[in-house]
Amino acid sequence: MRFAAFILCFLTVFSGKAQYFTVSGYVADSSRSPIPDVSIFITNGSMVGNTDGSGYYKFDLRSGEYEVVFNHPNYQRVSLKVVLDKKDDTLNVILPELAKSVGEIQITRKWTDPGPEMMRKAIEKKDYWASRFPSSSAEVYIRAFEQYNPPKKKENIWHEPDTALENKKKKKNKDDEPNINMAEILLQRDFQPPGKIKEIRTGVKKIGDVSGLFYLSTTEGDFNFYQNLIRIRGIGDMPVMSPLSGTALLAYKFQFLGSYKNDAGQRILKIKMSPRSISNAVFSGEIHLVDTLFYIYRTELNYPVNQLNEYDKFTMRQEFNLSKDSWLTIEKQRFDYHAAAGKGKFSGYTLVKYNKYELNKTFPKNHFGLEVSSATDSAYDRDSAFWSQKRTTPLNNTEIRFITRTDSIKRVQSSKTYLDSIEKDKNKVTFAKLFFKGQEYQNREKGYYMDFQPMMFIVQPWFPGGTRVTLWNTFERRFKNKRDIRLIENLSYGINNKDIRGTVIFTTTFDPFHRGVFSATAGRDFNFINPNAAFLDLARRGNFYQNTHADVYVRRELINGLYLRVQAEFSERKDISNFTFDGFADSLFENNIPTSFRTNRAFFGNFTLSYTPFQKYIREPRQKVILGSRWPTFSINLNHAIPGVMGSNIDYSYLEYRIEQDFPLGLLGRSEYRIVSGSFMRKNNLSPVDFRYQRRGDPSVFTPPMYAFQTLDSTFVTYKRFIEGHFRHHFNGSLINKIPFMRLLKLRESAGANILYAPERRNMLFYEVYGGIDKLIRIWRDRYKLGIYYAVGYSNLFEKPVVGFKLNFEYFDRRNNSW
C-alpha cells in the first residue's frame, strides 16, 4: 500500500510539472494588416508555429519562462518574454517593416487580402457542415411587425387662433400616427435532413392586416447558405447564389474586415462580400466564419435590389450555434424590409428565435408527410398571459404601446354594447348607402348578412339589346365552423325589348377543409356563345344567346391533391336575332350581327377530375392552405349531353386531357408549360354554344400565353382531336441585367413558343414564338408588369408569317407569390 501511494504521489507531481499552456494571438504590420507565414521560435531555437493567412497563430508550451521570437524575411524580428505559470497567454504582435534597398529603389512585400482564401476554405468544408444539421425538434417564436409611416404634412405658416391651432395639432398628430400590423406565432418545428419540416403552431396572434408581413411560418423559405442557390418566392422570382456556392469565388468579391472573439472564446472572421458584376444575382453584406473550423457563425446580407418584387430593401441576419458534439443549429433570424407606398413608407421586421432544441431526435416513420404545418384548435385563442410567458424576446416600447392599445380596443370591440352599436350603424338606412355604397343589413347573433345594390348602378347600358334596369342582392349566413350559405339574386328589365330576366344562385361551403362547395343556379339570362373569344369579339352581338337554365354543381377534394367536379344542367338556348338593339353598339363594331341558330334544349353532365401528386399543404383550424407541388397537374374533363330528357335534343360527348406545370431552372429563371388535347367522341347534334373553339390572337394585346395564341389569324371550331402546347420561360433579368446599367431599370425578360395541330383544318400545323421585356411598376404596395412583346407566327396554311408587337400587363398576386 505504501508503494502504491508513493507511485500515485509521484505521478501527481509529475503531471503537475508537465502542465501545458496555450499561447495565441495575431501578427500584423504597422497598418494592422495581418501577416501570414511568420515563423515563431523559442529561446532554444525550436520552431513552435507559424501564422496562417489571417495572421493568427496558436501553440502550446509547458509552464516556464520563454523568449518568443517572431521572424519574417520582409519584417524586423521581434522578441518577447513570456512567463507561463497559471493560465494561457495572448500575444498580439506588430512587426515593423524592413525596407530592402537596391540602388535607390526600396522593395516592400505587397499584402494579399486573405478574405478569398478564407472563403475558399469555407467552400471546401461546405458539404461537411451541411451534413452537421441533425434531425431535431425546437420551439420557435416568431414576431413580425410592420408600420406605415405617412408623409409629413407641411406646417401652416399663417397665424391661427390658439384653439383652432390646438385642434389642428391634435388632428395632425392623429393623422400622422403610423398604421401598424403585427403577428406573433409560437410553434414546434420538427426537422429531418435533407429538408423535411413539420410545424405544429400552438399560438397565433394577428393584429391588423397581416397580408404584407413576411415569414409567419418557417415553411415560407429555407435560408440555408450551404445550398448553392437560395430561392424565396415571397421576396423575388429569381434564386440568389449562396456565398458558399461552388462558383461563388467567380461571382463574389470577398474582403477580410478583421476578427473578434465570441463568448466561447472562438475567433470569428468578418468577411465583406459584394458582387463582382452588377448583373450577378448575389447577396451583399457580411458573412462571419469561425476560424479553423470555417462554418458560418453569423450572416448579415442584403437581397439584390433588382430581384425584389414587393420591397425596396431587404436584409436578413442569421446566427448559428455549434454544440459540444459538433452539431450545427440555427439560433435566431431577423428580416428587415422597407417599401415605399405612395408618398409614405412601409417598414417592418420579422424576428425568429429558436430554443429548447432536442438534437438527433427520432421521429415516427410517417411523421414527415405532405402536411408541413398545422395549428391546434386553441392556437388562435391565446390570451395576453400566454404571450407574456412565451415571448423569448421582450417587446420594445412601440410594440408595448401598440399591443396594450389593441388589447384594450379588442376588449371594447368584443363587448355586446359595442357590437350592438356597430350593427345598428350598419343597418341604418342613409342616402349615401342607398345611392352610392349599397345598403347593408346584418344580425351577427344569427350570422345573417345582406347586401343591396347601390341605386347608382341600377341602369346598365351594356347589355345585349340595349339598356336594362337591374337589381341584385346578396344574402349570406356564416357559421363558426367556417361553413357558410349564400343566396344571390339578379333581376333585370330591358327597356328596348320589355323583357324580364334574372338568376338566383345558391352556394354553400359544406366542407371547408376539403374545399367542398355545392351550388344550385336557376334563371333566364344572357350568356356567351364562346366565353374564350378574343377581346374584341367577346362583346359582339354574335357572341350572345338567351339561356334559360337550371343546374347543380359540386366540387370537393377526395384525397390530397385529387379534386372532383360534377355539374348537371338543363338549359334552353335561343339566339337573340329577334331583339331590338341600340345604335350605340353599331358604332363600336362593324358587322355587329347576332348569330342565328335553332332553339334547342340540352341536358348534360360535366365531370372534371384533376390530380396534383405530392401536393403540400398547411392545416388551419377547419381550413386548408395549398402550397403546391413539384409535380405537374393532370386533368381530364368529360362533357356528355344526353338527348330525350325533358325534350332535350342536343347529343354529343367531348373528352379533353390537360397537363400543366410551373418549375424553376436555377439562375436561368423559371418555366411553365400547358398541354391540351381534346376531341368529340360523339357529335350527333350540336349548337354553336357546344362547339370547341380555337381562339384567335388579339391585335396589339399580349394575351396570357398559357391559354391563348398571339398570332392565330382567325377563330375556328375543332371537332377531331387537336393538340395544343404552350411554353414560356421567365428569365427574370438573368440576361438583360448583364448589360451595364440595365439592372437599375428593374426589367424582366421572357420568351416562349406555342403550337397547335388541327387535322380537320387541312392538317393545320401552327406555331409561333414570342419574346419581350416587362418593366416592374409599383402602385401603393401592389406590383405590376407593363411590357412590350414581339410575336412571330406561321402555319402551313399561311402565305407568309404573321408578326406584330403586343402590349403586356400582369399583376403580382401577393397571396400566392406569383404573377
Question: Regions from the language model: what does each represent?
Answer:
Residues V38-I42, V68, I107, A138, ...:
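Hydrophobic beta-strand segments
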Residues P239-V240, G369-W819:
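Exposed, low-structure sequence patches enriched in small/polar residues
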